[in-house]
């Protein structure tokens, strides 16, 4: 039971004091580069290139893709947290882990970047449960007060940081 509570994604992947701009919301939105409506499968957290990115739960690094391509997610990490959970951290600059690494919640795994289809430095963060995308905003309140969580919720709105 303790293993599961540490594996479930439950903290902000970036220090909330480093957030810049609004949070790009989960769900349908207008793609800022393709100019079409499509699902946004995660949230966008704006920051500065080089800001530390942290694992949101214990797990194993399933995938690391390092690229400077201006396509898709750019440089990204996928972590398997077991118990049906996976997380994706995309548009990264530097990666501090490799495939197969065991990681713990709060461990620095990467630096925020601007790779892939992106209109500014930010982290695109996804939570998947049993193979389906779920709204990450519901998984980030473990390390904040109710008031801080309400501030995050109220700032989550459509943005043009990226286009997945």
Task: Cite the ranges covered by each PLM segment.
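C-terminal appended segment following the main domain
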Residues: 111-112, 117-122, 133
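Solvent-exposed coil/turn segments that connect beta secondary-structure elements
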Residues: 27, 50, 58, 66-67, ...
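Acidic, glycine-rich catalytic/binding loops that coordinate metals and/or anionic ligands
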Residues: 98-107, 126-164
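Short hydrophobic beta/alpha edge segments that flank linear recognition/processing sites
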Residues: 45, 75-79, 104-116
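Zn2+-dependent peptidoglycan hydrolase active-site motif and core
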Residues: 55-99, 121-122, 126
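A residue-level detector for short acidic-glycine micro-motifs
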Residues: 24, 47, 63, 91-94, ...
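Surface-exposed, glycine-biased beta-strand/turn segments
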Residues: 1-74, 105, 159-164
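Short, conserved secondary-structure segments in the cores of folded domains
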Residues: 41, 49-52, 93, 99, ...
């Amino acid at each position: 039971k303790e293993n599961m509570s540490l594996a479930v994604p439950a903290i902000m992947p970036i220090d909330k004091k480093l957030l810049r701009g609004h949070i790009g919301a989960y769900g349908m939105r207008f793609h800022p580069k393709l100019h079409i409506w499509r699902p946004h499968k995660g949230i966008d957290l704006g920051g500065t290139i080089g800001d530390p990115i942290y694992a949101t739960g214990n797990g194993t690094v399933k995938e690391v893709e390092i690229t400077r391509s201006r396509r898709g997610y750019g440089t990204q990490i996928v972590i398997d947290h077991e118990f049906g959970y996976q997380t994706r951290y995309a548009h990264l600059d530097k990666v501090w882990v490799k495939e197969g690494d065991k990681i713990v919640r709060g461990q620095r795994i990467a630096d925020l970047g601007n790779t892939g289809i992106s209109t500014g430095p930010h982290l695109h963060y996804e939570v998947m449960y049993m193979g389906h995308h779920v709204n990450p905003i519901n998984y980030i309140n473990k390390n904040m007060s109710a008031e801080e969580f309400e501030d995050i919720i109220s700032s989550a709105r459509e943005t043009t940081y990226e286009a997945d």
